[in-house]
Amino acid sequence: MKFCSLFHVLSFCCTLAYAVPKSQFLQLHSLSNAIPVEWKWYGSVDEDSGYVYLTSKDSNEARSGSLWSTSVLRQVGWQLSTSFVAHVSENENTFFAIWYTSAVGSEGPVFGASDKWDGLLISQEIDQTGKIFVRGYLNDKSFELAQFTDPDLPPFAKCTIESSPEALNNIILKYGDQSGLELFVNDKPCFQVKDVILPQGYYFGVSSQSTSAKDLVALSNLNILPPDTSNNENLNPTSNTKQSVGDNTSPQTVIDTEGLNAIKADLAKLFNLVESQRQKMDSLHFALTNALERLNDISSTSQFPSERFNALEKLLHDSLSAQSSTADGTSKHLAEFEKEIKKAMGNAYSPYNLTNFMVFLLLGAIVSYGIMLVRRDRRRHKYL
């Protein structure tokens, strides 16, 4: 009799062990660069064939289930990546939520979380056609979400994503102190809000709630990654690997754009200097022409002493000498710069050969014009 009782007790314990998952703590990350996170489940959660069902497949009543991280995240920025399949078979929609809150949620009326939560909620409602209605909420324990939505708490962002029934949907949620909050659904941008500020040291959670025994949400992965993971395709381990285009082509030529931009900047400065000298020379030419005409008129009448003429001639001579010196310096600068351009052209890459050739032609024109100004200055100086 005692042996039979002991046998029944052992059989009952084995049945319980088989009916529930082996462990209440899961490691769901599947990417090599993911931050290791341990998840604890609440409510009706099942494991089967590589999926984690947030609502039990065997329950015949409305149910909710959730997974919450067992430790907080200390990083300023982060990315959450997950993939899920929603089975919606009746009139009522199925709900799936992503959380970032100050406290771990427990079983409750809001997608499997308690009311008056503090933090971020990304709500996803899936209908029979597979269409996903996404809404983002922020709460500071002020609002009670006794149902799926609260009219007093409008979403700060929302979008609608077209999908198909029982399709594998990929979710990527990014947060950074500079970029704000971004959400991608099936590689499509849902929203980006830059003025959302989330504190450090909060818990992550995912949850689901359904009103039908035939509706459920199954997760295939759940990864928390550093904020510097930039390639969206690498965040999704279930996406197909795309063959890169041009694998057999030769590597592209690296172009020294900084050096070319520096040359263009120097050329622009030099052109402005030559243009300024040209304007000064034109003004000086006009003034000297009038001065020489006036000097000839005065010398013909001999109304002033000769020292006045000598002083005026010295003034004109000094002015022309100064302009000639400036023109000589400009010409020398142009000649040196021409050598640098030729040297740079010898080291330039093929995509910029045409640009360098045009720069060389423009430089030649500037040099020629500068030499002409110098010669004209010297002719005027010789005339005086």
UniProtKB/Swiss-Prot annotation:
Region (Disordered) location: 227-251
Gene Ontology terms describing biological process: endoplasmic reticulum to Golgi vesicle-mediated transport; intracellular protein transport
Organism the protein comes from: Schizosaccharomyces pombe (strain 972 / ATCC 24843)
Signal peptide bounds: 1-19
Keywords per UniProt: Endoplasmic reticulum, Golgi apparatus, Membrane, Signal, Transmembrane, Transmembrane helix
Record-given protein name: L-type lectin-like domain-containing protein C4F6.05c
Matching CDD domains: lectin_leg-like
Localization terms from the record: Membrane; Endoplasmic reticulum; Golgi apparatus
Positions of disulphide bridges: none
Residue ranges of the TM segments: 354-374
Residues exposed to the Extracellular side: 20-353
Membrane topology label: Single-pass type I membrane protein
InterPro entries assigned to the protein according to its UniProt record, in alphabetical order: ConA-like_dom_sf, Intracellular_Lectin-GPT, Lectin_leg
Any GO CC annotation of this UniProt entry: endoplasmic reticulum membrane
Top-level division of the source organism's lineage: Eukaryota
GO molecular function: D-mannose binding
Positions in the Cytoplasmic compartment: 375-384
Primary site of residence: membrane
